[in-house]
Amino acid sequence: MLELIDKGSCSDTHPTPLLFVHGGWHAAWCWDEHFLDFFADNGYRALALSLRGHGGSPAAKPIRTISIADYVEDVVTVAEGLPTPPVVIGHSMGGFVVQKYLETHQAPAGVLLASIPPKGIGPFLMRWTKRQPWPMTRALLTGKSLHIFRSPEIVREKFFSQRTPEAEVLRYAALLQEESQRVSRDASLLLLPHPERVTTPLLVLGAGRDGCFTVKEAHATARAYGTEAEIFPDMGHNMMLEPGWASVAERIHSWMTSQGI
């Protein structure tokens, strides 16, 4: 059974549930720090799942072999168990999973935060390999990448801006876990999204201090879905954990209100 953190309840004002999908090396805990309570307090039912092999969600096979299709299946499982289709909100790899989910499933709306772009993670991997050639080579050879994050400096570089206190970076770094090697292949070439198949309205948010995906890539993601990206200039990749997380949550809330959700 998938780990699911479920807070708040649907209200007359907000009858549509929200389903949050985490990124690589993370789990449902990253949404439970701030976002779930924020949206529950604003009258929504807010749920975050841990994808299989993450957090408290078991996996029937080694995590290195889990695919993007497996993660999409997890989202389908949770979404179909809700009384009405949820808004799907994905961060980083979770944004990629949301894009794939929306190719074949209808949703009232979707939100992409610092998401893997539709063209995949090829440029990201090249940038990272140039920055850390030996750790990345080791990850590719062994299928294990968690060792890359043993340095708090790298955790901050990839996920957090300088505004995040060091104690918080260390606390979150301790919660990171292994990620699937198969997903790197899927998100590089094998299973790229098809934006033309998606009809769901999307809000695309990017971070100006993102150590994973560039502002240019955030704008390219938005263009692929016929919208414009909104950039939070001083934020790092983990927009839901950064000191300015509330401004991101408030923007999502106001946008959903404008969509009648």
Annotated model-derived regions:
Residues G23-A27, S92, G208:
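Active-site glycine-rich loops that stabilize anionic/oxyanionic intermediates
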Residues G24-L36:
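The serine-hydrolase catalytic nucleophile loop
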Residues F38-A60:
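Conserved alpha/beta-hydrolase
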Residues G56-P86:
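Active-site loop/oxyanion-hole signature of alpha/beta-hydrolase fold enzymes
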Residues A107-T142, V183-A187:
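Flexible "cap/lid" loop of the alpha/beta hydrolase fold
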Residues V198, V204-G206:
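Short beta-strand/loop motif that positions the catalytic acidic residue
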Residues G211-A220:
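Conserved alpha/beta-hydrolase "acid-adjacent" motif
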Residues E228-I261:
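Catalytic active-site module of serine/aspartate enzymes centered on a nucleophile-bearing elbow/loop
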